[in-house]
Amino acid sequence: MGETVRFGISMDDQLLESFDRLIEQKGYANRSEAIRDLIRAAQVELDWEEGEKEGVGTVTLVYNHHVRDLSDKLTEHQHAHHDQIISALHVHLDAHNCLEVLVVRGKARDVRRIADELIGVKGVKHGKLVMTTTGEGLH
């Protein structure tokens, strides 16, 4: 980690009040830590948009396991991407519905494509990709 540098920020007083409320709600120790976190989040988002950097994400799926061949199709997708899908958690929500959380690692564009394929399988009730970073390059 590099040397800490102090700098000033000018902003509208209402925006600052809103920011201070956010800091309190999120439990940040101070404005500096909140700003650092915002910058890191923007960096991660940019990396995902560019698509070339290594990233990691979770794909969350909710589906009815009684739908014909759905479980098999999802399993086939997972096996087709066994190098990128590094972990899977399967939860029985009730007698019919399942929750599956997959951890996917790879180039951001590949992770997004895999997530889209899984979420797009007919019979998936809800799916969501949550993208994050491997932590490499963040300070």
Swiss-Prot record:
InterPro entries noted in UniProt: Acetolactate_synth/TF_NikR_C, ACT-like_dom_sf, Arc_rbn_hlx_hlx, CopG, CopG/NikR_regulator, Ni_resp_reg_NikR, Ribbon_hlx_hlx, TF_NikR_Ni-bd_C
Cofactor: Ni(2+)
Domain of life: Bacteria
Record's keyword annotation contains Oxidoreductase: no
One Pfam family this sequence matches: RHH_1
GO MF entries: DNA binding; DNA-binding transcription factor activity; nickel cation binding
Biological processes, Gene Ontology terms: response to nickel cation
Positions bound to Ni(2+): H79, H90, H92, C98
Statement: the UniProt record of this protein carries the keyword Kinase: no
Annotated keywords: DNA-binding, Metal-binding, Nickel, Transcription, Transcription regulation
Family, similarity comment: Belongs to the transcriptional regulatory CopG/NikR family.
Function (record text): Transcriptional regulator.
Protein name per its UniProtKB record: Putative nickel-responsive regulator
Biological source species: Citrifermentans bemidjiense (strain ATCC BAA-1014 / DSM 16622 / JCM 12645 / Bem) (Geobacter bemidjiensis)
